[in-house]
């Protein structure tokens, strides 16, 4: 029996809801009208962090600091423990998580916390060919204050595979949505680009979709085999500043970018 892919939606005071993938046909047409991402300035602050299933005790303190004036939090390896769910619903209007796989108690996967409801939501999963576990991605679209629609892609890429066929397939499944979207895009997360082959596949993919890479002056991103694992790509936006924050609250350091 094929397992259905879905997102789990958390909203304060409401029952937990399963959200199934919306049709890509809606991207080529008119999406529902939404409420703009709340921002007191013209800048959009985005945080990207592999939170390591909250295995280190200081995760909540660091995450609380990161939420200050951030409209979007893109987490990877977010395990929906009561503590994380309480944090998400207390600090953000809505949180969507894609369970990559079910742990004994709480599912783990990518999770996007936002200050407004998405007008489009499509969870994706790809199975690790060697470990037979899944990695997840989440595509959401939000209204901006200038009435443009922002596509946000939260990615945790396949890690263990021979060659890059499955890795590229995961990216290409995301690309189907990006190609149909008219407007700005942010694609970010843990891309596990630890080999030359993987990095080249990622670069080809982002060039094809006209996505630019965010660079960091003081680059403290987590490294594996001499290459960074975490990236932020974008189009039709400008960067005000971009930083990496060193921390021992996870095995990855969070990335923070202000767009305008």
From Swiss-Prot:
Q: Which GO terms describe its molecular function?
A: catalytic activity
Q: Name one Pfam family in it.
A: Exo_endo_phos
Family recorded in the similarity comment: Belongs to the UPF0294 family.
Keyword Cytoplasm on entry: yes
This protein's record includes keyword NAD? no
* Lineage, highest ranks first: Bacteria, Pseudomonadati, Pseudomonadota, Gammaproteobacteria, Enterobacterales
The places in or outside the cell where this protein is found are: Cytoplasm
By what name is this protein known? UPF0294 protein plu0699
Q: Which UniProt keywords apply?
A: Cytoplasm
List the record's Gene Ontology CC terms alphabetically.
cytoplasm
Against InterPro entries, the record matches this protein to: Endo/exonu/phosph_ase_sf, Endo/exonuclease/phosphatase, UPF0294
